[in-house]
């Protein structure tokens, strides 16, 4: 199944090299970043799940970039809020 998925996923991304980068990034997110898979896991490895998500059009490089930016902004806002709370507590 993974071989067929790779061929279909290449068509969605454009070339094999970008596919490797996007799939690895997404697989890492699922494995270590606490991100939930967007397709049923079906006892597949993280890389296969990432390829299936790409094949179905659920994940692209642009989608990952937007999500990363949103998470970074949320993290920065939380840090600012925490620093503000600490500063107000010292007054």
UniProtKB/Swiss-Prot annotation:
Q: Which keywords describe this protein according to UniProt?
A: DNA-directed RNA polymerase, Nucleotidyltransferase, Transcription, Transferase
Sorted alphabetically, which Gene3D superfamilies does this protein's record hold? 3.90.940.10
Q: Which biological process terms from the Gene Ontology are attached to this UniProt entry?
A: DNA-templated transcription
Q: Does the keyword Cell wall biogenesis/degradation apply?
A: no
Return the GO cellular component terms, semicolon-separated. Answer: DNA-directed RNA polymerase complex
One MF term from GO for this chain?
DNA-directed RNA polymerase activity
Report any Pfam family annotated for this entry.
RNA_pol_Rpb6
As its record notes, the protein acts as a catalyst of:
RNA(n) + a ribonucleoside 5'-triphosphate = RNA(n+1) + diphosphate
Keyword set includes Metal-binding: no
Q: What is its EC number?
A: 2.7.7.6
Q: Which HAMAP family does UniProt cross-reference here?
A: RNApol_bact_RpoZ (MF_00366)
Looking up NCBIfam families in the UniProt record yields: rpoZ (TIGR00690)
What biological function has been recorded for the protein in this entry?
Promotes RNA polymerase assembly. Latches the N- and C-terminal regions of the beta' subunit thereby facilitating its interaction with the beta and alpha subunits.
Give the multimer and partner information.
The RNAP catalytic core consists of 2 alpha, 1 beta, 1 beta' and 1 omega subunit. When a sigma factor is associated with the core the holoenzyme is formed, which can initiate transcription.
User: What family, per the record?
Assistant: Belongs to the RNA polymerase subunit omega family.
What name has this protein been given in UniProt? DNA-directed RNA polymerase subunit omega
């Amino acid at each position: 199944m993974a071989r067929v998925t790779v061929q279909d996923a290449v068509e969605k991304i454009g070339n094999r090299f970008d596919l490797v980068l996007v799939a690895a990034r997404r697989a890492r997110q699922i494995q270590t970043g606490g991100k939930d898979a967007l397709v049923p896991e079906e006892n597949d490895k993280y890389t296969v799940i990432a390829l299936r998500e790409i094949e179905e059009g659920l994940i692209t490089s642009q989608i990952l970039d937007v999500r990363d930016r949103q998470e970074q902004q949320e993290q920065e806002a939380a840090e600012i809020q925490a620093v503000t709370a600490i500063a107000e507590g010292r007054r």
